[in-house]
Curated annotation (Swiss-Prot):
InterPro entries: DNA-dir_RNA_pol_omega, Pol_omega/Rpo6/RPB6, RPB6/omega-like_sf. This is DNA-directed RNA polymerase subunit omega. Signal peptide: none annotated. Belongs to the RNA polymerase subunit omega family. It catalyses: RNA(n) + a ribonucleoside 5'-triphosphate = RNA(n+1) + diphosphate. It comes from Pectobacterium atrosepticum (strain SCRI 1043 / ATCC BAA-672).
Length: 91
């Protein structure tokens, strides 16, 4: 298991409070959202993986926001297609 120093991750994010929010958000995505890690798992817990991704500059708040918006737009487009297909089937 790789040792993660929080100081390296803090430098990437800006302050430790935002680091906690970003790391928790990413760890939650990894655990429940079916997201794939951007670094090798190496038998680490999701929080450690999230911190390693932040240290490597692969994840920050802006990146998470962009990804969330993209996924939301894709989901909304799929829902609109489904509703349209249902509506056309009733005609």
């Amino acid at each position: 298991m790789a040792r993660v120093t929080v100081q390296d991750a803090v430098e990437k994010i800006g302050n430790r409070f935002d680091l906690v929010l970003v790391a928790a958000r990413r760890a939650r995505q990894l655990q429940t959202g079916g997201k794939d890690p951007l670094v090798p798992e190496e038998n680490d817990k999701y929080t450690v993986i999230a911190l390693r991704e932040i240290e490597d500059g692969l994840i920050n708040n802006q990146i998470l926001d962009v990804r969330d918006r993209q996924e939301q737009q894709e989901q909304e487009a799929a829902e609109i297609q489904a509703v349209t297909a249902i509506a056309e089937g009733r005609r």
